[in-house]
């Protein structure tokens, strides 16, 4: 059986032994010599250093360090030397005896002035003299002027370089005239030139142009390119994108958020809306019309990757929200309110209505033929004197004659006759008194298949 010998306990280092045993005086002599550097080898080096210089070579009795720079192996790299700063001095602990007070005063004792000190007395002639007077003695002040009088003199110099401008005199009585420039006399000499004023406004015939159209010198500003291939198109359905867009990126919802500026955010992995993941910037909003809708758009910037230098790389996203559709224009088919071929009710006016047995109305047909159209106007007349057909006005400038069945009590009227207008005469508007209407030749467009009436509802426009 092999006996196991107890392991040898390692002795403490010389430095540790020196710290504990130096104060008590129980240190071995080899420990003291090694720590304090008083060994035989140290003494030989001290003696030899008197004649030769051995500094910086690292020659000593301690462990080999290879000098100040250390050992450098062949083909290798030197180790980095770390400078160790100075250690703090130890705190000296002062023992407190049993008779010392346990309360330490922080404020020094102040000097106390003893009460009851005598009042200092002032002697000599340099002090103030206090003179007491009785209540019956009046106070008299000597106000006699001195012999020497004070004289005040003033001197003024005139410098033309710093002279004040001419003073405007009080304006005279105003005048009543068409001239708005009333001169006011000024004192002094005038240093300016009087130029007679010219009138720019001139009288004309009234046909001169009074307005002009400026040239479009300002170039049109191009809008943001939101629908390019480099932008990802994302549609936002919630209405918070219009009022609080930051609530879709972060959970912080400020009370006052600017709506027309660029918003910046910190990159985060927890966002309320997944479409706004990695969004670090939302640019200013823009309103546009797209396919019949009003669209609210914002251009966003993502921060998908980060480089070592701290640069953020990511794509651009176009977030848009359709506010409301633009309704198409409602088309209403227009219909003529009156017929151009039957206007019998527009010409007959009955003054009074006689009994049915006393009158027998007869119908007279009057035909007026013009190129490309014909018109027949029936009129109703009576053989009695009380019923007379009077044509007020006509929608065409054509001659109108009375029939033989109309008999007036006094004499036979002679209606003014007008010669038929030549069809080749170019006439667009016919004027009768204070009213005008379009010429019937241009009521219809002959070259178009669809016939559209080219007149108003009643056929007349009051001037």
Swiss-Prot record:
Belongs to the papillomaviridae L2 protein family. It is found in: Virion; Host nucleus; Host early endosome; Host Golgi apparatus. The gene is L2. The keyword DNA-binding applies. A motif (Nuclear localization signal) lies at residues 1-12, 444-452. Highly phosphorylated. One of its GO terms (cellular component) is host cell nucleus. Disulfide bonds join 21-27. Keywords: Capsid protein, Cytoplasmic inwards viral transport, Disulfide bond, DNA-binding, Host endosome, Host Golgi apparatus, Host nucleus, Host-virus interaction, Late protein, Microtubular inwards viral transport, Phosphoprotein, Viral penetration into host nucleus, Virion, Virus entry into host cell. Its main location: virion. Interacts with major capsid protein L1. Interacts with E2; this interaction inhibits E2 transcriptional activity but not the DNA replication function E2. Interacts with host GADD45GIP1. Interacts with host HSPA8; this interaction is required for L2 nuclear translocation. Interacts with host importins KPNB2 and KPNB3. Forms a complex with importin alpha2-beta1 heterodimers via interaction with the importin alpha2 adapter. Interacts with host DYNLT1; this interaction is essential for virus intracellular transport during entry. The keyword Ribosomal protein does not apply. This is Minor capsid protein L2. One of its GO terms (molecular function) is structural molecule activity. GO terms for biological process: microtubule-dependent intracellular transport of viral material towards nucleus; symbiont entry into host cell; viral penetration into host nucleus.
